[in-house]
Amino acid sequence: MRFSTGKVAVLALALCQSTYAYGLKATILADTNRDGKVDVKGDSDIKAKTTWTPERGALFLANIGDTNQRCSKIWGPSQDIPFVDGEGYLDECNDAIGNVQRNPKYLAPLRTLPIAKLSASAKGRVHVTNKVAASKVRIFVKEGTEWTYVGANYTFTAEDLRGGLELGIDARDVRRPKGWDGKAQVHFTVSDGAQKATDSVALRVAPVLTHHHVQPAERVFSTGADEDIIQGRFVADLEKNAAAAGIDEPVFLFDNGDIWTQDFFEPGYTSIPGPDGPIVLRVMIRSVQSTRYSGRDVFHQLRNDKVGAVQHHGDGDTIDSTGNLETIPPYKYKGKNYPAGRIIQGQWEGRKPLMFNFLKAQQVQDPVALDTAWLAVGHVDEFLQFLPSDNERGWVLVVDDPVAGVELLKKASREGHGSMKALSRPHLPGEDPVEYCLPKETIDQVLKLKKFESINKMAAQRIEGNIAILKRETGLTDDEIFRVPATFYYAFSDGWTCNISPTNSTNPGAIPTPGPFSTPGPSTGPSLSKKAVGGGPVFKAKSIIEAAQPHGPVHIGRREVDEKNQLVAFYPGTVNGVVLADSFVLAPKPWGPVIDGEDIIAKAVQETYARASFNVTFQDDWFSHHVGMGEVHCGTNTWRTTDTKWW
C-alpha cells in the first residue's frame, strides 16, 4: 500500500495524538514556512522545522517598545539625566524587561498538538536550550485573555496538554555582533509515568532593517527652533514642503538643540509574517555616539507600543553619524537576492563606522563600505542618493558631478558673466546684513580660488571610485546613473569670504570656522569650536562635525586622516536632500549665479532630476545648515512604509 506525501504527513499528525497504541508523542510547531500562521491541521510547518535557514524557519520579534511610554515617564526628560550615570539605563527599560507581557501583539505563535490520552499525572515543559538564547527569549502561554510567563520550571498539567497549548514567543533583545545571534531552539517535553517524549522547533529573532527610498516616506523629523529665527524658518519651510509632498503626519520636532536630525538616529524596523501581512515594530537605531545626548531622545520621545529603539555602545565621531548610512534599494545580482536592499557606509582609510558590525550581524542588508576619507564630514549622503524608478531595477542612482559644476561656472565666465555675483542668495526677513553676512565673490573670483578646478577633479575621481564599487556590487549601469552639477572645496581653508570680523558678530570671542568660508584676519588653523563664518553669523548651533565629536579624551586620535585636504560642499549640495515621494525630492537651494533670470545651478539640477522623472522643490538651508557643513538632508529624518517582505 502506497501513501502520498500529504497523506503520510496527516497520518503522522494523527499518530502524534495517539499515546498508548503507538507510544507517547510530543509535537510543537511554529510558523516555519513563514505564511503568517501555524498549521496544526496540515503538514506545511512540519518539514525541516528543527533547522533554521535564511530561506525557511520561524521568525519572532524583539518586543522592545515602550507601551504607554512607561519607561519615559519613569526617566523624565533626557537632559535631566547626567552623563556620569552612563547610557545603560536606556537598555534596562522596555516592554520585554521582566516577565510581564505588556505588548502581546508582537508575540510570534507557537502551538503544541493535543495529546488526547494522558494519565492525570502527565506533565509537560517548554523551554529554550542554550543559556545565552534562554536569557534573551521569553515564552508565554495564553490563559483566557491573559498571557502567563513560562519560566524554566513551569509545568503544564495533563489537562493543559490534552487541549494543546497556545503559546507566544518574543525576545528581550535584537541580534548583536559577538553576542546572541538571535537563534533559539524551543523544546517541548512530555512525561507520563515511564514514558517520555520530546520535540523541538527552530526560530530566529527578526533582523533590524533600515529604510530605502523605494519605501514612501510616512513621517518627517527635524529639530525645533528654540527661538532661533533661522531654524524656525527652516522648520516652517519643511512643514510646508512635507505637506506638499502628501505626507499627512505632522513633522515631529525634537527639543534637544541638535539640529543635525539625520545624524543621531536611523529609523528602521523589524518584521515577521502575520496572518494579514507583516507584523511590524519600528526600531529607531541610535547613532554609535554615546556622548551625543540627543540620541537618548529616540528612547525618551519616540518609543511607544509600536516603536522601539536600540543602541550599539561606542564613542564614535563624524563617520559614526547616521547621515553616513544610506540603503541601496532591493535588487538581485549574480545569484544573490537582497529583498530589503543593502546598507552603505563611508569609511576613512579602512576605518569603518562602529555600527558596521551591528548592521552586519543582522545578516540581511549586508553592508558595503564606500570611500569618504576625502570628505571632512565623511558621509555618503554628501555625494549620492537613490531614487525610486519605474525601470526594471526599480531605482536609479543620483551622484554629484564636480567637473560639471565647475564647467557651469566656466561657461558663464566665457559668455561674459564672470563679474556677476557667484552667490545669488539675498538677505531674508529678519536677517541683519551685518550679523548675517553673505559672500560677495564674483564667478571669476571663485574660479580663481586656489586649486579650485583641480580640487573638484579630485572629488570627481573619488566619486567615480565609489560608483565603481556600487557597479561591482549591484550591476548598476551608466544608463541608471544621473549626475548633477556640484562643487567642493577645502573644508579647513579659505573659500567663500565675507567682510565681517568676529568682533562685529553676536559672539565677540568666536574664531573663524572650518569649511569653505573664511573671515579676514590671522589663520587659526582647523578648529572644531563654535565659529563666526564668512557665510553668516556666529554659527549658533554646533557644526555637523562638532555635534558628532565625543566628549572628553575618548576622541583623541580618531581623526587620523589628512584633514587639510578634506573637502566639503562649496555651494549647497543638492544631492544631500530628502526623497519624500516617488516623484518629489526636497533639495537644498544652491543659490547659484543668476543669468538671464535663472539660477544656472538650480536649472541644471532640475533638468537632471527631470530625466529621472522627479520634480525638485528647493529649500533654503544656507544659514541653518550649510554654513555648519551640512544640508537639508542632514537637518531632517524620515521613517517610511514597512509593509514589504524581506524574507
Task: Set out the residue ranges of the language-model regions.
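Histidine/cysteine-enriched polar flanking segments
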Residues: 20-647
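Fungal secretory targeting signals
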Residues: 1-21
